[in-house]
């Protein structure tokens, strides 16, 4: 196994072991407040998770929490942010630059409103009610330039860096077909062990990592890895 891949897998396993201490508490929160979301434990498809709910207070409360966050921060069909020139821009140039940035902002929100952002951010806010919300933003195509997906918390493991801020996000994706890897990671490189499994309808587990690149000074840069485990 590649040394870089081995290092990240070891870090993931260590972070996951630390998270396991909190899984029973998270699972109980999900059972009472978010029974429709995926469990931290293995379950069969279609298995009921609402047998412990005798009062709808928590379930309704989470829905209202997510709706209020969405309407207050990122309301549907509204321009909730603007791109404007910063303080380093000379005053005599700001008006012209602001006009150009206004066109960029208009295009950005046109893309957002025609995407699945509203639906996915709502699910992410529901996860935020009991823990951490994770919203994955991926490059799309000419029809859908940007794709959003709210990643269920059971799929994600977080780790912190030297400043106690989250600098590693691990996502374990199970039952991924080898044939789908070139479509999922068009810029990826695949060794012979991976390519030899393609075309045989075989599956693998993929560990995705988004991590801070500390080698880049004076800039908040991140790296994206995908490892077949």
Question: Which stretches of residues belong to each language-model region?
Answer:
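Extended, helix-rich architectural segments
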Residues: 1-205, 211-221
């Amino acid at each position: 196994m590649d040394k870089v891949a081995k290092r990240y897998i070891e870090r993931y396993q260590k972070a996951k072991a630390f998270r396991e201490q909190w899984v029973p508490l998270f699972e109980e929160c999900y059972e009472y407040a978010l029974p429709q979301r995926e469990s931290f434990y293995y379950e069969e498809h279609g298995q009921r998770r609402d047998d412990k709910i005798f009062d709808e207070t928590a379930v309704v409360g989470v829905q209202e929490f997510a709706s209020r966050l969405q309407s207050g921060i990122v309301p549907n069909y509204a321009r909730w942010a603007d791109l404007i020139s910063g303080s380093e821009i000379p005053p005599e140039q700001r008006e012209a630059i602001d006009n150009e940035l206004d066109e960029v902002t208009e295009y950005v929100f046109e893309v957002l409103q025609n995407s699945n952002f509203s639906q996915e951010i709502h699910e992410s806010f529901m996860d935020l009610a009991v823990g951490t919300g994770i919203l994955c933003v991926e490059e799309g195509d000419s029809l859908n330039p940007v794709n959003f997906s709210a990643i269920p918390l059971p799929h994600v493991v977080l780790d912190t860096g030297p400043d106690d801020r989250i600098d590693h996000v691990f996502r374990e994706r199970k039952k991924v077909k080898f044939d789908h890897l070139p479509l999922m990671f068009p810029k990826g490189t695949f060794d012979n062990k991976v390519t030899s499994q393609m075309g045989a309808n075989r599956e693998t587990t993929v560990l995705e990592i988004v991590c801070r690149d500390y080698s880049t000074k004076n800039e908040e840069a991140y790296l994206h890895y995908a490892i077949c485990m």
